[in-house]
């Protein structure tokens, strides 16, 4: 579906063959996030920022508001048995039950972290799409916050550097300012849900800060 959409400077490798346990797709020349941002120029970083702006602005231009409360409640119920924060789960459930959670309905990548982008000087290649329990660009913003603000992939892959941290902080600040009007209760609910969804993968004190913030 994504490959049929038009986003400025964003592409996805063409998939040729899909089997049960694997798929074949075009080879894409580019760099992972650590390679790219370790040597990125100011212009390279601005290119990434502007390309993300174009992506989200395009999604917003066709958005329509929908009530996502039932889908969120269903997801909350699926997390009950897996969490070490049962009281927080109950708090979230009651909050969603008492308040309609309205989100802008759009396409979303489903797992838009920088680990799922191949970086090129004049292109970003999105890979590893996932189904999203709530189809909204807010879900993509939440995943970017996971990477840019909480430094999830950087710490997970043990490639932290002050340079990358500063670049990520800059990119997230830009996104936060541009989409400030969407950083509302719906965004914060989805953000909290994302932290609970990745809780089983939080294996260190450094990673657990995602749940505590």
Regions found by a protein language model. Give the residues of each.
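Conserved kinase catalytic-core helix
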Residues: 2-9, 28-73, 85-100, 105-108
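Short beta-strand micro-motifs within the conserved protein kinase catalytic domain, predominantly
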Residues: 13-22
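A glycine-centered beta->alpha junction motif in the catalytic cores
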Residues: 21-42, 189-211
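Active-site activation/catalytic loop segments of kinase-like enzymes and analogous catalytic loops
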Residues: 139-179, 192-208
């Amino acid at each position: 579906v994504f490959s049929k959409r038009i986003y400025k400077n964003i592409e996805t490798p063409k998939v040729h063959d899909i089997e049960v346990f694997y798929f074949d797709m075009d080879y894409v020349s580019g760099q992972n996030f650590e390679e790219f941002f370790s040597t990125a120029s100011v212009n390279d970083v601005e290119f990434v920022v502007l390309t993300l702006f174009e992506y989200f602005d395009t999604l917003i231009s066709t958005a329509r508001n929908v009530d996502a409360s039932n889908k969120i409640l269903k997801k909350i119920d699926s997390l009950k048995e897996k969490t070490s924060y049962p009281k927080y789960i109950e708090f979230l459930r009651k909050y969603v039950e008492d308040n309609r959670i309205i989100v802008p309905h759009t396409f979303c990548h489903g797992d838009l972290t920088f680990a799922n982008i191949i970086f090129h000087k004049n292109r970003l290649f999105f890979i590893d799409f996932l189904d999203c329990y709530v189809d909204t660009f807010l879900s993509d913003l939440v995943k970017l916050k996971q990477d840019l603000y909480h430094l999830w992939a950087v710490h997970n892959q043990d490639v932290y550097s002050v340079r990358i941290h500063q670049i990520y902080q800059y990119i997230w600040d830009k996104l936060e300012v541009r989409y400030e009007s969407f950083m509302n209760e719906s965004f914060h609910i989805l953000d909290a849900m994302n932290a609970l969804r990745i809780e089983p993968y939080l294996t260190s004190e450094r990673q657990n800060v995602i749940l505590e913030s």
